[in-house]
Amino acid sequence: EKYLYKSLREAQLSYENPLDGKTPNPYHNALHGADVFWSARHLTLALRSELRVSLKLNDNPNVIFDISIAALFHDYKHCGVNNYFLIRTKHNLAMRYCDRAVLEHHHASEALRLLDRTKVTENMSYKRRSEFRKRVSSIILATDFVRQNESADKVEHIFAKYLKAVRGNDPKPELHLPSFQDTCLQNVLNLIVECCD
């Protein structure tokens, strides 16, 4: 708990003190991080209670923790410009991340580095830490505007069968859903944070 508080406090300070150390970011700041966090939490809990299928949300507190962390840190250390600008100006970040989802890679990398440094992941097993890092980075990377429709298309396809079964008064519409393996769950989590961002 104290480690999480330390990382959240450091993240808040980072949002308040931008990379250039001069100009506060008027949009990608601590308030935006908190707004996306609360919106994602609300949407996740609403999905959990409204759907007749668990999405692995009911029985897995790790999922709620992971999406919460991803939402809070999705714009961590944002420099106040967009990917296009970074690529066009040949910024070091663009070079580091090969012109692909530059800011999102930066946010994910820096967030995971902070969480490790502040020992948030210290007591996680190797398997859990790996799952955490994969889930959080995937959610943050999905906030890239270039990929905005990717998660939506995947989730729409999955739920089309489910909705058809519900509208057809099928007594067990959940049988038309694939078992919610990690890939499907990940797409739903990605979409939640994309919508909230």
Predicted regions, residues:
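Acidic/His-rich, divalent-metal-binding segments that scaffold phosphate/diphosphate chemistry
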Residues: 1-101
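Divalent metal-dependent catalytic cores for phosphoryl transfer on phosphate-bearing substrates
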Residues: 55-196
